[in-house]
């Protein structure tokens, strides 16, 4: 949950100065779930908008100060709908207890609902500018940190716990080898060549994964430092790489779990919790590898993306 809370503070840093003064004027950081799916409707009124909707996946909402929610609202020209993110105090939102899951239980990602809540204009931000790294906050702060493209940053930050989970799963498997004996003998599994092969392969995969995550982080930061808007093709490529990192994290955890024997399934064994958490995390929409690859393939063929990148 910590990484989600961190990246949501970063998201708020992409807003204009007035919104950031509302949020950070009295404290240096806050907790705010970000439910960006267009599940709400925002009606323009004098001085702002009236927002109504219900959103899933409110990570951190049980400890929240504010909520960030996505809603459709008429464009300036009035001829289309645009997806915007609205910031609302938690006191004006309803938290609905829905988070009964096998993994990531501690995030408390319950549903969020608001009904006809007034949101001043400065607490609204068009998501399109945030995706490309061309937000008001990027211009306000003038640093590479806030000029990075949004979706790769969100994916990269959320991927870090998956990689950490994979590395920890391998470490737990290694510890278990010195404790388990071959069935019907006193020979420790740590003495068996097959165990050496499994451990070497799992550790090598986990090390390669960590190196890849760091390289993608450098690539994302480089776009922030470039002073250029990150193009769709590059954003799509980064999302494919991040999705592949999380999928490999999931597979490493699965393989370590399978190799650790039946004891790994006891509820007091941390390996089964890592297994549940990483498998649940891998299903997050930002890691949808099929969708990411589709967009990347379309852009490589000079076709327009048909989903956000």
Language model features: what each stretch is:
Residues 51-53, 114, 166, 209, ...:
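Buried hydrophobic positions in well-ordered alpha/beta secondary-structure cores of metabolic enzymes
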Residues 30-33, 101-105:
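Short Gly/Pro-enriched turn/cap motifs at secondary-structure boundaries
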Residues 102-103, 109-206:
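Glycine-rich beta->alpha junctions and the first turn(s) of the following alpha-helix
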Residues 1-64:
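Glycine-rich flavin
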Residues 208-244, 254-265:
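C-terminal helix-coil-helix/basic helical segment that borders enzyme active sites and/or dimer interfaces
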Residues 164, 171, 200-207, 243-250, ...:
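Generic structural signal for well-ordered, non-transmembrane alpha-helical segments
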Residues 260-309:
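Glycine-rich phosphate/cofactor-binding loops in nucleotide/flavin-utilizing enzymes
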Residues 54-93, 97-98:
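DPxDG-like acidic metal-binding loop motif
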């Amino acid at each position: 949950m910590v990484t989600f809370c961190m990246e949501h503070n970063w998201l708020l840093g992409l807003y204009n100065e007035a919104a950031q003064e509302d949020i950070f004027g009295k404290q240096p950081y806050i907790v705010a779930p970000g439910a960006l799916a267009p599940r709400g409707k925002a009606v323009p009124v004098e001085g702002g908008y009236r927002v109504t909707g219900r959103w899933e996946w409110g990570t951190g909402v049980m400890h929240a100060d504010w909520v960030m929610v996505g809603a459709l609202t008429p464009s300036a020209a009035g001829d289309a709908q645009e997806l915007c993110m609205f910031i609302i105090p938690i006191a004006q939102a309803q938290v609905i207890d829905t988070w009964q899951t096998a993994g990531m239980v501690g995030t408390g990602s319950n549903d969020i609902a608001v009904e006809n809540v007034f949101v001043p204009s400065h607490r609204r931000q068009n998501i399109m500018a945030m995706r490309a790294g061309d937000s008001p906050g990027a211009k306000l702060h003038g640093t590479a940190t806030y000029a990075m493209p949004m979706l790769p940053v969100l994916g990269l930050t959320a991927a870090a716990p998956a990689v950490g989970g994979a590395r920890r799963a391998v470490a737990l498997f290694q510890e278990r080898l010195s404790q388990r004996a071959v069935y019907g003998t006193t020979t420790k599994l740590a003495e068996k060549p097959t165990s050496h092969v499994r451990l070497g392969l799992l550790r090598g995969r986990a090390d390669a994964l960590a190196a890849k995550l760091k390289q993608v982080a450098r690539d994302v930061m480089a776009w922030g430092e470039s002073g250029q808007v990150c193009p769709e093709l590059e954003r799509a490529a980064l999302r494919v790489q991040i999705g592949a990192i999380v999928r490999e994290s999931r597979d490493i955890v699965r393989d370590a779990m399978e190799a650790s024997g039946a004891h790994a399934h006891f509820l007091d064994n941390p390996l089964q919790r890592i297994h549940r958490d990483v498998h649940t995390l891998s299903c997050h929409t930002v890691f949808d590898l099929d969708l990411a690859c589709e967009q990347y393939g379309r852009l490589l063929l000079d076709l327009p993306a048909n989903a956000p990148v």
